Curated annotation (Swiss-Prot):
Native source organism of the sequence: Homo sapiens (Human)
Keywords, in A-Z order: Cytoplasm, Nucleus
Region (Disordered): 1-134
Gene responsible for this protein: KLKP1
The protein's name: Putative protein KRIP1
Domain of life: Eukaryota
Compartments reported by the entry: Cytoplasm; Nucleus
Biased composition (Pro residues): 119-128
Bias kind Polar residues: ranges: 9-24, 43-55, 64-79
Keyword Cytoplasm set for record: yes
Tissue: Abundant expression is found in prostate, restricted to cells of epithelial origin in normal and diseased glands. Very low expression is detected in pancreas and ovary.
Induction data: By androgens.
Length: 134
């Protein structure tokens, strides 16, 4: 029983040492992390980034209080057909735009590889050669 009591007393003494140092360091911390003052919270970079992640997406980069804004298409122009009338006729996107082009990269790649021939040797010599020469 005596070694158990000795270990407990040593643990309590070790536990009292960090609390004394923490009590010395802790008084300047509460005014920095006061949850009642949003100005101090927003001055910290982590606080604003957390709130912007909650109200994702936020492409405008607004502060925390103005992060909940509707997307550009819904706020100013609720009719999507007017956007197509303003920007012009809809453009049909070709899934393979090179299929109609005269230069087809897929057809030219084998010819390019044949014209180059075997792969060129590296500029640096083999590391085993200088050892053999020495």
């Amino acid at each position: 029983m005596s070694p158990v009591h000795r270990s407990r007393t040593s643990q309590t003494q070790e536990a009292h040492k960090p609390t004394s140092t923490l009590s010395f360091i802790s008084p300047p911390q509460p005014p920095r992390q006061d949850p009642k003052s949003p100005h101090i919270l927003c001055s910290q970079p982590n606080a604003c980034s957390r709130q912007s992640h909650v109200s994702y997406p936020n492409p405008w980069g607004l502060p925390c209080s103005q992060s909940k804004v509707s997307p550009p298409g819904t706020a100013t122009n609720p009719n999507p057909k007017e956007w197509s009338r303003i920007s012009g006729p809809p453009v049909s996107l070709d899934p393979q735009p090179w299929s109609s082009a005269p230069f087809k990269p897929t057809a030219q790649l084998p010819l390019l590889a044949q014209s180059l021939g075997p792969p060129a040797k590296p500029a640096l010599p083999d590391p085993a050669l200088p050892l053999q020469m020495l």
